[in-house]
Amino acid sequence: MSGPNGDLGTPVEAGAEGEEDGFGEAEYAAINSMLDQINSCLDHLEEKNDHLHARLQELLESNRQTRLEFQQQLGETPSDASP
């Protein structure tokens, strides 16, 4: 697959027959596989980010409600009740 620096591990010869652009089928397949792995990782990160965002929104709303309840118990008027 790839080395620690992202190298494909197979050097491409400039004068290879049938490879005018310098890349063969194996190199394209390796790059495609790496891109698929990166895409999967990014999808996973996006899902985790969405989940964390939803949980933080819930926590924020819960904290607002708790603060309002404490203010009402103390007989104070809420100074920042708007979201």
From Swiss-Prot:
Residues 25-74 form a coiled coil. It comes from the Eukaryota. One of its GO terms (cellular component) is cell junction. GO terms for molecular function: molecular adaptor activity. InterPro entries: BBLN_eukaryota. Keywords: Cell junction, Coiled coil, Cytoplasm, Cytoskeleton, Phosphoprotein. It is found in: Cell junction; Cytoplasm, Cytoskeleton. Residues 1-25 are annotated as: Disordered. The keyword Cytoplasm applies. Its main location: other. The modification Phosphoserine is found at S82. Belongs to the UPF0184 (EST00098) family. This is Bublin coiled-coil protein. The lineage of its organism: Eukaryota, Metazoa, Chordata, Craniata, Vertebrata.
